[in-house]
Amino acid sequence: MIRLLIALFLLLASVAPGFAVNPDEVLADPALEARARAISAQLRCMVCQNQSIDDSNAELAKDLRLLVRERLKNGDSDEAVISYVVSRYGEFVLLNPRLEAKTLVLWGMPAILLVAGIITLVVAARRRGARVPGAPLSDEEKERLDRLLRP
């Protein structure tokens, strides 16, 4: 019985993301619906933040799904729909940000800082090893040091 319940739970959990898009949102044209689903999978839900609007049940995600479908019905291209949503919500709405100079800096900065840190450590280690040992103390300096260190 427990195995049956576990199997049923796993089956229901595996199809749960398919329920995010309500039947009243589905377009009659299968090609447009496929494009709408593909676009919705690329856009982040601003409420859930780690889900696409295709997977989210939030009201904002529903509104965005309807907006995507409406724009597609009006003849917009996929890129035009995505650009429209980005213009209203910013780059953060994209689950996979576009490759631009600022994203290259964001992704490249950790590697640059790592290389700079390694170079700094190597230079510091070489400088430390290159120090010339001091000259030995003279008898007078040893005597003075002994006097200073005695209680």
Curated annotation (Swiss-Prot):
One of its GO terms (molecular function) is metal ion binding. One of its GO terms (biological process) is cytochrome complex assembly. Heme binds at residues 45, 48. The keyword Isomerase does not apply. The keyword Methyltransferase does not apply. Its main location: membrane. It is found in: Membrane. Gene3D superfamilies: Cytochrome C biogenesis protein (1.10.8.640). Keywords: Cytochrome c-type biogenesis, Heme, Iron, Membrane, Metal-binding, Signal, Transmembrane, Transmembrane helix. Residues 1-20 form the signal peptide. It is a single-pass membrane protein. One of its GO terms (cellular component) is plasma membrane. The chain crosses the membrane at residues 104-124. InterPro entries: C-type_cytochrome_biogenesis, CcmH/CycL/Ccl2/NrfF_N, CcmH/CycL/NrfF/Ccl2_sf. Belongs to the CcmH/CycL/Ccl2/NrfF family. Required for the biogenesis of c-type cytochromes. Possible subunit of a heme lyase. This is Cytochrome c-type biogenesis protein CcmH. The gene is ccmH.
